[in-house]
Amino acid sequence: IYSALFSWLSIKRQGGEWLLRIEDLDIQRCRREYADQLEDDLRWLGLIWDEGGSMGGDRGPYYQSERSDIYREHFVRLQEKGLIYPCFCSRADLRVASAPHASDGIAPYMATCRNLTDVERAAKAKERNPSYRFAMPDGEMMFSDGNYGRCKYDMQKECGDFVVCRADGNYAYQLAVVVDDALMGVTEVVRGCDLLS
């Protein structure tokens, strides 16, 4: 609610439109009744959105679970440009690889599968379905944050190559949210500060 309030206030002050997108990619934990309750809570607080959610609008669908074809199209584009690659690491493999860094809370993926040969990939594909990771380029990324000002991060070092499509074929939040923001014309994103750490 905190993020919703601040984004609503910011958008209304600027004369913009407040969009409600339901980020329900995790079908195990996200049920439609939760989204309905969120809408009821926002209405009760007087935070009325201009489009999205059950209200609909021109840039929908607004439920990410209904946008798989859109994500597939952009996934294929990334694949054609060589910006993603298959990863055959299991969760157990990743836990072992990050064990020395467990006290850090999050250890970036060490790009174990990034430079596999086609022969190695074909052999691993016989054993398990891969997830797909974005090949994060080296170098610093800079952006302006409304609260923290100019921010600079070495994304390869701090995040590593992140999953864009899980081994079960479901698209990851990291791909979906970027595609949706671009296609829906989102110009301001209000998130918790945990995403900056």
Listing of model-derived features with the role each one plays in the protein:
Residues 86, 91-197:
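Active-site cores that bind ATP or allylic diphosphates and position pyrophosphate for catalysis
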